Amino acid sequence: MSAEIIKLRERIDTTFIYVTHDQTEAMTLGDRIVIMKDGFIQQIGTPQEVFDHPANLFVAGVIGVPQMNFFDARLSRRDGKYTVTVGSVTVELSPEKQQRLAAHNVAEQDVTLGVRPDHIMLCADGVKGTVDVSEMMGSSVHLHVTAEGKDVIVIVPTNGAAAHFPMGSEVNMIFGGNVAHVFDNTTGKNLEW
């Protein structure tokens, strides 16, 4: 259905306002999308802008399939560098994120850290988790993991090789400081923006 609507829009060359509760439709059909909650606009942007730079926890949680993972974390600043700590794992944020947080003079605080499932990597030493479910998707495996008291989804590429993660197996996970989103615990606002 989406392909037909896109073709129709291109053929008649006019502006469409399409209202949907299906975020996948919004992402695939819209040149620009408006995300609303309780009658209030949360964010306006291109699908890619909204996906890459969610304004708040609500937007981060509804845009993207599977949805973004959220961790309880600690944002720290030492020697002008911001780090986030989840459990026993500390990651330094990217230079771009450092600049944006510093520009807003963000203080050390407990935060909610958001990381998309395809931005989490398995490693030898990281945030520890237990596999609850392993879903083979062909080119990837979707792991449903319990880590730090949270349900986490990790997308692991199979690279053509069979990937087997039995229920109950232990995994360690890490994420890059360039892909983590830092949200205020009180307001839910993305602290970079």
Q: What spans do the regions from the language model cover?
A:
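Phenylalanine-focused residue identity feature
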Residues: 16, 40, 51, 58, ...
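ABC ATPase nucleotide-binding domains
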Residues: 1-61
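Non-catalytic connector elements of ABC transporters
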Residues: 68, 77-193
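C-terminal boundary and immediately downstream tail of ABC-type ATPase nucleotide-binding domains
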Residues: 53-78
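Residues located in well-ordered beta-strands
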Residues: 46, 58, 72-74, 128-132
